[in-house]
Amino acid sequence: MIQTITHIMIISSLIIFGIALIICLFRLIKGPTTADRVVTFDTTSAVVMSIVGVLSVLMGTVSFLDSIMLIAIISFVSSVSISRFIGGGYVFNGNNKRNL
């Protein structure tokens, strides 16, 4: 009985995450500004990590956890890169002055 309830909850969470992924991909394509697309990309990567985690629980394996870490690292690096691109490539020094 408990296994059936757990299985139903896992399947329903996959459906909800799938709907969230479709909404995020729509906003990623439609987003009017680059900042909207960056936020949507971060949200999409979080949803994908959640889907992979739920699939890991469903299959009863921990081998997918490495791919979750890889998605998180790629998401972080891309967010920092795009943020730097939006900022014009400037970085801050200790005096709060911008340098190239």
From Swiss-Prot:
Annotated GO MF terms: sodium:proton antiporter activity
Intracellular or extracellular location(s): Cell membrane
Record field: transmembrane: 5-25, 38-60, 70-92
Keywords: Antiport, Cell membrane, Ion transport, Membrane, Transmembrane, Transmembrane helix, Transport
Subunit structure: May form a heterooligomeric complex that consists of seven subunits: mnhA2, mnhB2, mnhC2, mnhD2, mnhE2, mnhF2 and mnhG2.
NCBIfam families: PRK12657.1
Protein name: Putative antiporter subunit mnhF2
Designated gene of the protein: mnhF2
